[in-house]
């Protein structure tokens, strides 16, 4: 197949494309298509393969991979790495593309010292716009791309123009699947009986040691209450259970809430560390009767879309990006405002009774794959999003 070619150069600043993180997976899908359409791409890593100065392969071509810098978010090396890449490809229209929280880039030299254009695919996970985020997006050489309708509305209210292009998934992979890649039935793999109600959670256990954006404490407390009335239920939490990455010690939290250890399942630690394949994740999503994804605020929330593509209904927060990412048969939570002092903006905390009520409603609902959820998730197919979103945007940007 012959693809339209775009004459452009992009330094892609994010997690290393292809790594088993949300940004890594989004980066891989996007970089693959950029390279396919003739754009020169270099990966500027802030996580994943951060020590590697070498090459990655996408669309049958080698692209350079630059290592991280000395600062936490590698913003100290954006300018030198980009200028190095541009120097190897003189005369090509260029840009730096960021897929990360943009407040970390406010120390990047201003346009007078670093005149390169920036494209920032920005997560907006608060109910009000953080000033540090607005500061970056208001730079005259920054073009914002919002990944949710919520984000676009939020920027519009602040007088900041943006283009909406959502995160994407591969719907050829994320679809109803009964078995893992080794042929084992997913529910059997988890040790869940056919008549048991299975709630799944796919949320990173990363926090600042005090506040957990993924609302694990509220979810676990709600689960402890739910389990008393519906004991034939299991909770699968697809995350690292210890607090080793700055998150919560989930076994201690579960014990503090009186949750029997046999009602909770965690993934195999070594397998989790290496990363479950997307096919195996699709099988796990398909095994869930519902995905519980409460949060103080989401910039997007890929697991909710992946689960729905597999026919699994979801429970999500009814604010920030999540509110626009739930099908009609999904469930939205209520919350109370919470001030995020470091970001100077509002989140919301999901109410425990709202999570409990959503679990009960999901328990009483019809089981099995949801056609409504699958149809809703189809709009986020990677090739569809590329054709209606990224391709026309990049064509116009580099013309």
Question: Model-predicted segments: where are they?
Answer:
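Carbohydrate-associated surface elements
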Residues: 150, 168
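A charged, aromatic-enriched C-terminal amphipathic alpha-helix characteristic of glycosyltransferases
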Residues: 350, 364-394
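Nucleotide-activated donor-binding/catalytic signature segment of Leloir-type glycosyltransferases, i.e.
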Residues: 247-283
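Short hydrophobic beta-strand element within catalytic cores of glycosyltransferases
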Residues: 304, 313-316, 326, 331
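A short helix/loop element that forms part of the nucleotide-sugar donor recognition site in Leloir-type
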Residues: 175-192
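Conserved donor-binding/catalytic core segment of Leloir-type glycosyltransferases
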Residues: 11, 193-214, 220-223, 235-237
